[in-house]
């Protein structure tokens, strides 16, 4: 197969998740909510062997697959919602781009030709396109993405309908005390390409849309693209002033009680099928892991 895997590596199977949770409990880990995490940081409690589960965007498999498993094991978790993906007003372009690259040996993007015959070339092409897209300003972002998808006969809205939850799923989940919803912006823009006002508008609009649906205040936020390339001091300071209790990035790392002063740039650890509990054991001393 010529399928490439950047997006596939960001998810795990239901079987793996169920087994992983069982193994965590067998090894003495406590699975806590984002609110418990913040309380522990604030009180400087001993936080050895504690795990927080977080999920981004609002994928349908969060509802269909992950939720029943979390419910079965009584595990709290947080979903950072992007309303634009939930209401189908924007595209999850990263999945569409991967499909286009997988199915073609040569592609054109923004008037440039990229060869992608081998698996290595396809993987490289994905990261090249991703890098180019994340450097587009707000006015170019969807224009160039949508043009690329149309040129390749991709119906992104149809694809999104199969990938993401609907508001009815969100409302149902919000009635369960195990579930906390956070915000992930309205349109999933890379925030470092927006002005301060545009960032604030993106975040506040997302909050309002989610709060209107679930009738609860949104207190937590995840950057839509959260590496050191997209999130720096400027973006962190803006979010720090918007009243969130916590803000998470995708920078790799565990959480210490010292993060009390850095609650608006918390690191996380990506859970993959290759993740082993022993890896936590090597780095868990006096830390909380967010997954």
Where are these regions (language model features)?
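Acidic/aromatic-lined carbohydrate-recognition and catalytic surfaces
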Residues: 48-110, 114-117
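A short acidic, amphipathic alpha-helical/loop segment
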Residues: 65-69, 169, 234-238
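Generic alpha-helical structural signal
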Residues: 18, 64, 127, 142, ...
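Extended, charge-rich helix/loop segments that form flexible
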Residues: 89-176
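Electropositive, surface-exposed helix/loop patches at the edges of structured domains
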Residues: 64-69, 73-76, 113-132, 280-291
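C-terminal active-site subregion of NodB/CE4 polysaccharide deacetylases
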Residues: 1-54, 61, 92, 98-99, ...
